[in-house]
């Protein structure tokens, strides 16, 4: 019995020590990046910060669990924490908006306070809507009223926890060439167009990409597109599946596509999370 207690105590001490080492390492990396960022600003290379909009108002029906997928456990924390902490650690990000269902506002606020995130970034909780575009529209309204409309907007699905800071940096730097940038990966499977159980044609997969998030925009471009879209919401609601589509259809802005990340998948079923947790045991700093 005493031996078991000692073993548990030793394990706890080792975990705390490893956590401290990771924290010290991350703080060192952050200091180096901060110095590099300051140099960029002095050279005029950087003049706009980022507002991250993390969408987590969905019900996650395909998971077939009582608990919403954004709250499923990942490395001892709810799934959405991974995305929040990735943006918090990214120095270009100035503020985060967590867009949640009305019934989850209190729960998410509890996690924000528990983790002490507001010590590092400005964080606001915004009530989302029934559809994805309703949630994004709520975030844009908040930014226009209380946030910083001069910032770039990075819209990200909380159900995509396995994205890297390298992707964020590449998206940010691409904004010097375009006011709308999205990541994607080439489609590997052959895609067929079907009608009533009959294949009509095959699509050229060399031109097809599976699009991911974060999708990033100049705030004014995205805001204007949404203001044009919302009056026609009912007409378009079954066709719109991401933010870029609204910019495609309701603005003249051309959207730039860059290479995404293979592991940046959207968790839609339990098996996705189980597989990725095992494959990336050391991906998260917690």
Tell what function each PLM region has.
Residues 1-47:
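Intrinsically disordered, low-complexity terminal tails and inter-domain linkers enriched
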Residues 193-217:
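Short, flexible, basic/aromatic active-site loop/helix in glycosyltransferases
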Residues 2, 210-286:
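Conserved alpha/beta core of the MobA/IspD/sugar-nucleotide pyrophosphorylase nucleotidyltransferase superfamily
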Residues 54, 80, 139, 157, ...:
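Residue-level signal for inorganic ion chemistry
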Residues 47-106:
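N-terminal glycine-rich phosphate-binding loop and ensuing alpha1 helix
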Residues 91-92, 114-122, 146-147:
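Short helix-capping segments at alpha-helix termini
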Residues 122, 130-194, 212:
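Conserved beta-loop-beta/alpha segment of the NTase-like Rossmann-fold superfamily
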Residues 106-112:
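Acidic helix N-cap motif at the loop->helix transition within catalytic regions
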């Amino acid at each position: 019995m005493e031996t078991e207690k000692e073993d548990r105590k030793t394990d706890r001490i080792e975990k705390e020590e490893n956590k401290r080492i990771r924290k010290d390492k991350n703080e060192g990396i952050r200091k180096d990046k901060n110095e590099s960022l300051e140099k960029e600003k002095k050279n005029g290379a950087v003049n706009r910060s980022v507002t991250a909009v993390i969408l987590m108002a969905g019900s996650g029906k395909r998971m077939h669990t009582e608990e919403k997928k954004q709250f499923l456990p990942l490395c001892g924390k709810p799934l959405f924490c991974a995305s929040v902490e990735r943006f918090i650690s990214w120095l270009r990000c100035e503020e985060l908006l967590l867009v949640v269902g009305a019934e989850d506002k209190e729960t998410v606020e509890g996690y924000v306070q528990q983790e002490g995130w507001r010590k590092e970034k400005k964080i606001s909780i915004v009530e989302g809507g029934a559809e994805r575009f309703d949630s994004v529209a709520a975030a844009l309204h908040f930014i226009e009223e209380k946030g910083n409309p001069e910032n770039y907007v990075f819209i990200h699905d909380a159900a995509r926890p396995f994205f890297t800071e390298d992707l964020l940096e590449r998206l940010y730097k691409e904004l010097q060439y375009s006011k709308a940038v999205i990541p994607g990966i080439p489609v590997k499977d052959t895609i067929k167009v079907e009608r009533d159980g009959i294949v009509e044609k095959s699509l050229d997969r060399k031109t097809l990409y599976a699009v991911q998030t974060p999708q990033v925009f100049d705030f004014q471009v995205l805001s204007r597109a949404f203001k044009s879209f919302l009056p026609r919401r009912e007409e378009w609601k079954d066709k719109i599946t991401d933010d870029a589509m609204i910019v495609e259809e309701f603005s003249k802005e051309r959207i730039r596509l860059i290479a995404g990340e293979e592991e940046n998948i959207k968790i839609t079923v339990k098996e996705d999370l189980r597989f990725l947790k095992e494959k990336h045991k050391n991906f998260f700093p917690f």
